[in-house]
């Protein structure tokens, strides 16, 4: 399908990342982006500096940078950062007044206007609004957008709590705006969250945008039963590490292994780093922490084992391309005889995917909801 996006008065070519994903029906912008652009053009034509939060693939960044505004884009996604930079370059938009920050960086204090694409996680929204409340001058407009089905009472209450008086717009193309103005005064959000990891002496620390932020998720709990308990694996990757509990437990059972924690979320990688530092400080030097698009750029044939709990969401879309990419790049990164060990929901049919890719797949365990699978890299079998 075409990737031509008519945004305001200009047509852009916008690509969704990763570029080689199989589902080309997913596009890099949505009606919420269009609504924000039209609203700002009509109601804030004199805006010169803009702070954008959660611009998934750079649609907003491209439009307002094209208009020669000073744009700072803040995101928790490494992939979103790559997409924005790529799309600006593809549309030949100079990035002279464009900058990007990760979700844990200090926000700029001098902006005319804030735009937010509402994230899936309420806790992450609360964290972002809290950070804004600390830096915005009173009266600064804050305008958010989301699909109408994703604007809940709790969403509105978060804006009222951290920013100020809030109203919503009429729906246009199934999207809605949330319009607020900073009232001044910092209002703290309780992040990171700390909780005890059951069955261990570990305390887990989670930043706001990390999955299952205040307890162990049931998938990881089941996966713990099938983690390696041998020093045979000298190098292990926790791929899509989240808060790092899987890699942390692997390190506790394989104390001589080098563990690499990889995620595309800056908050996830920082949570994993904190959790190793808090709970296994003596092993910290055996660990590395990497924000990345899966394992792209990793050395081929270099690791003994990859542990993975693949996600099946990207932004608001349900998709399996991330799992496919993880499996393919894990195979490339594994040494001959190396193992990919995963947990997944039963209905996702990962067994068939791994068989097709590796030429083998073994069921290690299952319950009503999950399966734990193992695939070994053996090029002679393919």
Curated annotation (Swiss-Prot):
Disulfide bonds: none annotated. Pfam families: MTS. GO terms for molecular function: 23S rRNA (guanine(1835)-N(2))-methyltransferase activity; nucleic acid binding. SUPFAM superfamilies: S-adenosyl-L-methionine-dependent methyltransferases. It is found in: Cytoplasm. GO terms for cellular component: cytoplasm. The keyword Cytoplasm applies. The keyword Glycoprotein does not apply. It catalyses: guanosine(1835) in 23S rRNA + S-adenosyl-L-methionine = N(2)-methylguanosine(1835) in 23S rRNA + S-adenosyl-L-homocysteine + H(+). Its EC number is 2.1.1.174. The gene is rlmG. Keywords: Cytoplasm, Methyltransferase, rRNA processing, S-adenosyl-L-methionine, Transferase. It comes from Pseudoalteromonas translucida (strain TAC 125). InterPro entries: DNA_methylase_N6_adenine_CS, rRNA_m2G-MeTrfase_RlmG, RsmC/RlmG, SAM-dependent_MTases_sf, Small_mtfrase_dom. Its main location: cytoplasm. Specifically methylates the guanine in position 1835 (m2G1835) of 23S rRNA. This is Ribosomal RNA large subunit methyltransferase G. It comes from the Bacteria. Belongs to the methyltransferase superfamily. RlmG family.
């Amino acid at each position: 399908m075409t990737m031509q996006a008519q945004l305001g008065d200009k047509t852009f070519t916008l690509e969704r990342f990763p570029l080689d994903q199989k589902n080309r029906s997913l596009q890099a912008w949505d009606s919420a982006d269009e609504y924000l652009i039209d609203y700002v053009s009509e109601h804030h034509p004199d805006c010169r500096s803009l702070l954008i939060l959660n611009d998934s693939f750079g649609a907003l960044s491209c439009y307002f940078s094209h208009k020669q505004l000073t744009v700072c884009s803040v995101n928790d996604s490494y992939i979103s950062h790559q997409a924005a930079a790529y799309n600006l370059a593809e549309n030949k938009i100079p990035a002279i007044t464009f900058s990007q920050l990760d979700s844990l960086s200090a926000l700029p204090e001098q902006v005319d206007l804030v735009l937010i694409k509402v994230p899936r996680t309420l806790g992450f929204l609360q964290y972002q609004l809290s950070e804004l409340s600390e830096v915005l001058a009173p009266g600064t407009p804050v305008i958010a957008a989301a699909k109408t089905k994703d604007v809940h009472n709790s969403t509105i209450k978060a804006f009222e709590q951290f920013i100020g008086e809030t109203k919503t717009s009429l729906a246009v193309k199934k999207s809605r705006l949330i319009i607020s103005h900073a009232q001044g005064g910092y209002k703290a959000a309780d992040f990171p969250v700390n909780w005890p990891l059951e069955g261990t002496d570990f305390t887990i620390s989670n930043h706001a945008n990390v999955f299952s932020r205040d307890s162990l998720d049931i998938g990881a709990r089941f996966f713990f039963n099938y983690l390696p308990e041998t020093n045979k694996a000298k190098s292990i990757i926790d791929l899509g590490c989240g808060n790092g509990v899987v890699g942390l437990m692997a390190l506790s059972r394989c104390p001589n292994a080098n563990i690499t924690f990889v995620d595309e979320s800056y908050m996830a990688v920082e949570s994993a780093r904190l959790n190793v530092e808090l709970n296994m400080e003596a092993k910290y030097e055996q660990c590395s922490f990497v924000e990345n698009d899966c394992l792209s750029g990793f050395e081929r044939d270099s690791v003994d084992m990859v542990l993975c709990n693949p996600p099946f969401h990207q932004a608001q879309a349900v998709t399996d391309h991330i799992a496919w990419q993880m499996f393919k790049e894990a195979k490339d990164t594994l040494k001959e005889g190396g193992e990919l060990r995963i947990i997944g929901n039963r209905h996702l049919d990962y067994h068939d995917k791994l068989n097709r890719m590796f030429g083998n797949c073994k069921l290690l365990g299952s319950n009503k909801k999950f399966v734990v699978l193992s695939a070994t890299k053996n090029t002679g079998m393919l």
